[in-house]
């Protein structure tokens, strides 16, 4: 007899690794394009996003903080894609990142200290993009992305029912 209800599809771990690889390759290329070439308007927009992140960090409610920061983190990276005229690439990456986003929330954004760490990475990335230091911006991004998924195995163990 069929049952009604909500079914949460399981996450394919190998798909996540592929998405991480693609995202990293594309965004590294974008950082190369942008370093030293941001307009004053673009700098202002990135700094405004950083100000929003700082404001979110100061919030008391951790659930709201996590959700808002997650949305703002996506806004930060989407803006970088937009500045490099790669909005379509962001659309493709984000459309295919549902499982990846679920794991990001489970792995990182529940911890207040992790949110602050992400903000620090973003701030340093922007400073290096403005100064034209693509290599340091890319190193920071790689550390930021890799650090975001360091807890992946822990998440898989802790929430094994959600993974294939």
Regions found by a protein language model. Name each.
Residues 1-37, 41, 45, 82, ...:
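Short linear motifs at protein or domain termini
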Residues 14, 36, 40-107, 118-127, ...:
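Conserved amphipathic alpha-helical segments that form helical-bundle/coiled-coil interaction surfaces
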Residues 114-116:
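Active-site loop of classical SDR/Rossmann-like NAD(P)-dependent oxidoreductases
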């Amino acid at each position: 007899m069929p049952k009604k209800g909500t079914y949460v599809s399981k996450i394919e771990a190998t798909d996540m690794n592929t998405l991480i690889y693609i995202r990293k390759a594309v965004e590294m290329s974008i950082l190369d394009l942008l370093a030293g070439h941001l307009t004053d308007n673009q700098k202002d927009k990135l700094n405004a996003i950083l100000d929003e992140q700082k404001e979110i960090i100061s919030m008391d409610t951790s659930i709201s903080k996590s959700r808002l920061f997650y949305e703002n983190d996506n806004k930060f990276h989407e803006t970088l894609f937009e500045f490099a005229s790669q909005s379509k690439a962001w659309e493709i990456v984000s459309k295919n990142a549902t499982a990846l986003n679920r794991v990001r929330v489970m792995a990182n954004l529940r911890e207040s200290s992790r949110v602050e760490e992400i903000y620090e990475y973003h701030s340093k990335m922007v400073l290096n993009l403005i100064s034209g230091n693509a290599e340091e911006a890319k190193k920071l991004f790689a550390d930021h992305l890799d650090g975001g998924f360091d807890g992946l195995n822990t998440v898989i163990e802790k929430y094994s029912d959600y993974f294939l």
